[in-house]
Amino acid sequence: MARFHSSPPSFSQCRQVVCHLVWDQDFECSIHSTETKISRSMKRMALYLHHPECSKDCAYAMVNALSSDYQIRIFEESELDDDNFFDHIDIIAFPGGIGDSDSYPNFFTRTRANRIARFLDGGGHYLGICMGAYWAGSRYFDILNDVSPVQYIKRPNATVRRSYGTVTEVDWNGTKEQMYFYDGCALIGDETKFKTIARYANGDPMAIIQGRIGVIGCHPEAPLYWYEKPWQYINKHWNDGRHHTLLLDFVNELCPVS
């Protein structure tokens, strides 16, 4: 992954700004926050960041892909203890990273997980990509209904069999794409209880919306440098940012901007 010049913005620093990402020639990332008058119609998203469990790379890539339509704030797990935290957001989002069953309890007590569940019951939305999709499952936040996020690489006829950064074929609303993948999940369960937006080549659901919960196994937010260093063999699959548009469309369907 790339190195970063600056530390991530705090929740308060992101309160009235839209963050713009600039990738330099060494594929290092710096954050440039521009004071912006936020439209009242923009939905408010709280994006969790705790590097490396929730990767800076993944979080900032989500900001880059979604900040045109959403007011995005960065938050830390301790802020879930604030009774007023959810009063100021429409979507809570969890990016990819290396978080797993061993690290999860270090950040999220049952009380914090229950607060997220109550937020959803009250009309809030959840967005999870890769690790964030795993965390929607029964071993973690337990917010999905009859759906289990499971490792795609262990599924029958999976096109990827090891955990590494690569691309894999998906069918996104009828269009074949080679999308960035790093040990993401398939969403296995009763398909009558969710809408499938995208599938892996073996037919397993890859991106779904169930009520106010949207989860994605691959990385449509992936920026150009993920396709270049160090995995240069996937350069030819760079999509010119088209997958960012797919992600934006997905989130707009999950939580419309107007």
Regions found by a protein language model. Give the residues of each.
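A glycine-rich, often tryptophan-bearing local segment used as a flexible ligand/cofactor-contacting loop or short
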Residues: Y104-W172
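Catalytic beta-strand/loop cores that center a nucleophilic Ser/Cys/Thr
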Residues: R161-W226
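Short, positively charged low-complexity motifs
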Residues: A2-V18, D24-C29
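N-terminal beta1-alpha1 cap of cysteine-dependent amidohydrolase-like domains
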Residues: S39-H88
